[in-house]
Amino acid sequence: GEGVTLNFLISANTDIGTTKQTNQDSLAVKILNTVQGRMVFAVLCDGMGGLANGEIASASLVHAFESWCSQELPKLCKAPLEDNVIRNQWEKIIDEMNQKIKVYGLKQGVRMGTTAVVMLLTDQRYYIMNVGDSRIYELGDQLSQLTTDQTVVGREVALGHITEAEAKVDERRNVLLQCVGASDTVYPEMIFGSPKANTVYILCSDGFRHEISSEEIASDRKSVV
């Protein structure tokens, strides 16, 4: 079917914040001209492990996905993109990097890891992968969270044990169920869908959304559109 016309306005920003000495967020955003048309590829990782270790974990995973984008994606574009092929290749990257980061951490004597949100956007489809508690939002007529937090409180909310309001103040809200480099096996969440016209996609780490509420994100959109 007909896809949406892709015109891109891209903005990326990262900040150390007020309580850390190092910035453990890493990100990359690329506009791609492929034989199947223009695409956007974005990856954001939020590392943990103290000082430089979290930064190493997040940057190494971003680099692995950048390599996929430059080396593997052009090959895939020779034929129509398939959900399962993207899923398998991304899961392989996560699996390999989970082991590499874990081994590096053991050598350094530290526990380290990183969250990840990855998005490939074409005029027909979006492909999303999520590990941990970074998020991807879709902001059109209303704001919707496309990813599901892989956290203890996220699971409790999903099971109906606590409310969204209770989750925001629960002291376990930063406890991850999944983390690249710290989990024995990582089970990424995969999401596939069709992009809508006049829509903003927001990739953000937990530090951003703990400071800025969903309501503020939505109202900011209304003030600039």
Range-by-range predicted roles:
Residues 1-225:
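PP2C/PPM-type serine/threonine phosphatase catalytic domain
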